[in-house]
Amino acid sequence: MTKYALVGDVGGTNARLALCDIASGEISQAKTYSGLDYPSLEAVIRVYLEEHKVEVKDGCIAIACPITGDWVAMTNHTWAFSIAEMKKNLGFSYLEIINDFTAVSMAIPMLKKEHLIQFGGAEPVEGKPIAVYGAGTGLGVAHLVHVDKRWVSLPGEGGHVDFAPNSEEEGIILEILRAEIGHVSAERVLSGPGLVNLYRAIVKADNRLPENLKPKDITERALADSCTDCRRALSLFCVIMGRFGGNLALNLGTFGGVFIAGGIVPRFLEFFKASGFRAAFEDKGRFKEYVHDIPVYLIVHDNPGLLGSGAHLRQTLGHIL
């Protein structure tokens, strides 16, 4: 008889839940719920389990916020809870809450070639560290290393490191954003809101008044080539994505590859392919040759958060991935 575990991927807007076959890692019965419709994560889980009429005693949920102890208060949502209390209330034997990019990183060993698009570099070196980052509502970052037949995710808040400009234009943008918001982290330019910040700064640098645009508006106008400012903002976004990814590669010598997740880049894939992303990734001065062969991949799997939550749980329960 198949034994299932509960897996989840919870963001500021939606909660995605699914079942994971503990033996094979296969994800099934995925369903998305609006977080606004439920008073708590526990309530969503109860509805899901009731709908699917399956006995589950183990679970792993990925959430888009730092996980530093038993109490979890979501960054972009009102939900807050004790992990131990929720485990007890649900009658689970094991329940773990992990950072969303811990989950994405743990999905990487489970991905197939059709789930990846490569942007330059050579083949990944087996056993070497891996980096993963992705722009969405924010900028998530994690690393992954392989130690004693186990994958170990190294989560953190790398999206909040300082934005490091490396051109005159980027320096001007930093000054404009610093005057507006104070500290300028990488996330302030590499995210949905970050794309808006880039657009606004480009326009203001020319002493003009920016329109009140959303990320979707900027992307659409850039792809239609109907707005020079929007096209410049999207081009610069791709370049800064490259610089940031190259920095991650240098930090840990990620010859196992650098992986891009998140919902933004797939929306303008052809534009991204033709952009200055890879040149910026390799623009490391004396260490250009060091990063030259490091491959970069875009993850195009539908649910890497669910896949990675399942992989993390299965490994915790003793399975070798």
UniProtKB/Swiss-Prot annotation:
Keyword Membrane (UniProt): no
Catalytic reaction annotation: D-glucose + ATP = D-glucose 6-phosphate + ADP + H(+)
Keyword Transferase: yes
Record-linked Gene3D superfamilies: 3.30.420.40, 3.40.367.20
Classification via CDD domains: ASKHA_NBD_GLK (cd24008)
Pfam families reported in the protein's UniProt record: Glucokinase
E.C. designation(s): 2.7.1.2
Binding site for ATP: G8, D9, V10, G11, G12, T13
Molecular functions per Gene Ontology: ATP binding; D-glucose binding; glucokinase activity
Keywords: ATP-binding, Cytoplasm, Glycolysis, Kinase, Nucleotide-binding, Transferase
One GO cellular component term noted in the UniProt record for this chain: cytosol
One example of a Gene Ontology biological process annotation: glycolytic process
Main location: cytoplasm
Subcellular location: Cytoplasm
Enzyme class: transferase
Family, similarity comment: Belongs to the bacterial glucokinase family.
Protein name: Glucokinase
Originating organism: Escherichia coli (strain SMS-3-5 / SECEC)
